């Protein structure tokens, strides 16, 4: 079980870190997220770059699904701007634990 609590917009709060350049839609400004799961790392703050597509990335990886074209395009746009692809939430999880 995994519950991700987040929201889509920053609500007008100023952020001192500029969002990375990618395609015309994002990723946008940083927003907080909380991961609730028995597989979540305890007392862990993940500093990886995520966006709303990270939830789709996690589902794709977890269930070994084909990568959606939009995710591939976003990754290519980030790479073209010298950035790494966005995370898939697995950095905050201990998936090898049963």
Which residues make up each language-model segment?
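N-terminal pro-sequences and low-complexity stem/linker regions of secreted or lumenal proteins
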Residues: 1-98
